[in-house]
Design a protein with these regions (language model features):
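Flexible, polar/acidic helix-loop-strand segments at domain edges
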Residues: 90, 321-394
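Bacterial Sec-dependent N-terminal signal peptides
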Residues: 4, 16-42, 190, 223, ...
Length: 506
């Protein structure tokens, strides 16, 4: 299928914050830092181009300073300690104690996305007749999904957040300098946006628009939002609406979920698109690439060509403790995690099989084969980039979420039935249904860890269910301060807006 590339090349990014901008012959949106001609929004192509910029923020393509969803994967896994084996590369929780760490980029990414959505919603309504009513409706649904997704991410990571719902005049500093709203109000806004989006968005897009938000994506995140506020009846309803679409299913082979050869499959609900662009560079040096960095980050240190990009960066090995926690018969362990002494035939190893030496430099670690597939086989700096998509929400995760929703709704049998669907794909026997909530949650969180390691949402299942501190103590002997259930607000934003109050403990 043809991929949609979330290109922002038609825009000039002039600022990184929301307040630092000035007037010129171009309009400037203070929320996004994007300048564009006052008459830019003339037709559907212009609206689509601006919309794609919202996806590009999530994608974080071609930039070390805003890795988008890639950095969110790393941050969550590092907090869990399942990324970077502690015996070789300890990752202290205090790395996240300062509001100048990498988690700042998530806050800024979300508000840039919200800014684009707000501006687009305003322009759609004031379009001078260049859009048909169905086009206006569709663009409205898509913009509300992106805004809802961004507010969802803010509430999930930071709790309280500033709720901006309209574009602002550049000179109106009072309108920009708002206080954070309580987390409950942020979730209420998420639900409003995603309900609207789910009612409008299509089941599928044509091949030329693969990757744009769909009805299924809106319903999946709507169900999750209801989980956060413990509205189990509505969470169940949204989940049932998604199942009724008849679109999604588990792939028989998990390897196909993490492959540049098989993307946008029946298991994918929301998937960020990447593409290798020959002759491109990283964002600060010419035309940016639209590949992701995870293959480069996860290749074993010193593996050599053609087994890893640049012979193996080894930035983020996987914790051996995670690898050892799997049932020996679990296909997920066999196919998606490798340890020294095992063999791996990645997709881009020139047809060769890599026998991982027992004395490899990172000999105490494991290696994540969800993203490590071998050398990218590109020239020079281009090899950093890889065109494998990143699935942000997939059906297996949805089924595990639905399992929790059903248990909380009193349907224990249904809860275990959905959990066991995921286990069956992994080659494991069914678990016997347990009515004790603590036993069920223990079963469920183990399954989430084994299924969703090195994916965007796993850490937040632990914080949402209040089990993060217990997990770190039981698995890694770490005492987690309560503040780490949420990330710190970027100090630069607090300096610009004194009404922003830092999260407790930071």
């Amino acid at each position: 299928m043809k991929k949609i590339i979330y290109s922002t090349l038609i825009f000039t990014i002039l600022i990184s914050g929301m307040w630092a901008c000035k007037k010129s012959f171009l309009e400037s949106d203070p929320q996004t830092g994007v300048k564009f001609d006052a008459n830019f929004f003339k037709d559907r192509k212009d609206f689509d181009g601006f919309m794609f910029g919202g996806y590009a923020e999530i994608q974080g393509a071609g930039s070390f300073f805003n890795l988008g969803i890639q950095q969110w994967i790393v941050d969550g896994g590092a907090m869990m300690q399942d990324i970077r084996d502690r015996s070789e590369q300890p990752y202290n929780l205090l790395s996240y104690a300062t509001p100048t760490s990498t988690v700042s980029s998530a806050w800024q990414t979300c508000y840039k996305t919200i800014g684009r959505a707000n501006l687009l919603l305003s322009k759609v309504q004031t379009s001078p007749g260049s859009l048909t009513d169905p086009e206006k409706n569709l663009l409205t649904g898509e913009a509300k999904f992106l805004r809802g997704f961004a507010f969802y991410s803010l509430a999930q990571r930071y709790g309280d957040a500033v709720i901006y719902l309209t574009p602002y005049d550049v000179a109106d500093q009072a309108a920009l300098s708002l206080a954070r709203s309580p987390e409950a109000q942020v979730w209420a806004q998420v639900i409003l946006d995603l309900k609207d989006a789910a009612a409008i968005l299509p089941l599928n897009w044509d091949a030329g628009n693969t990757g744009r938000a769909t009805k299924g994506a809106a319903l999946a995140y709507l169900a999750n939002a209801y989980m956060y506020v413990k509205d189990w009846p509505n969470a169940k309803k949204a989940s049932q609406d998604l199942i009724a679409l008849g679109k999604y299913s588990l792939l028989p082979n998990m390897r196909n979920l993490f492959s540049h050869l098989t993307e946008n499959t029946a298991e994918s609900i929301f998937e960020i698109q990447y593409k290798f662009v020959p002759g491109s560079k990283i964002a600060w040096s010419g035309q940016p690439n639209y590949g992701n960095f995870l293959n480069w980050f996860t290749g074993p240190l010193g593996a050599g060509a053609p087994y890893a990009i640049f012979g193996g960066q080894g930035t983020y090995p996987t914790a051996r403790k995670l690898a050892d926690s799997f049932d020996p018969n679990d296909k997920r362990r066999k196919e998606l995690i490798k340890v020294p002494g095992e063999s791996y035939a990645g997709e881009t190893m020139a047809g060769q099989t890599y026998n991982i030496p027992l004395n490899i430099t990172q000999k105490n670690s494991a290696f994540n084969a969800k993203w490590w597939t071998g050398a990218a086989n590109q020239a020079g700096i281009e090899e950093w980039f890889w065109n494998q998509n990143i699935i942000v929400m997939r059906y297996a995760e949805f089924l595990l979420n639905y399992s929790e929703i059903l248990f909380e709704s009193g349907d224990v049998a249904g809860a275990y039935s959905n959990l066991n669907l995921v286990r069956a794909r992994a080659g494991l026997a069914n678990l016997v249904a347990q009515t004790n909530k603590e036993i069920f949650l223990t079963d469920l969180m183990k399954e989430r860890r084994w299924e969703l390691f090195w994916e965007p949402n796993i850490w937040y299942h632990y914080t949402r269910t209040g089990r993060a501190a217990k997990f770190l103590l039981d698995e890694y002997g770490l005492v987690m301060a309560p503040k780490f259930n949420k990330f710190p607000i970027p100090q630069g934003d607090i300096d610009l807006n004194p009404k922003l109050i830092q999260n407790t403990g930071y």
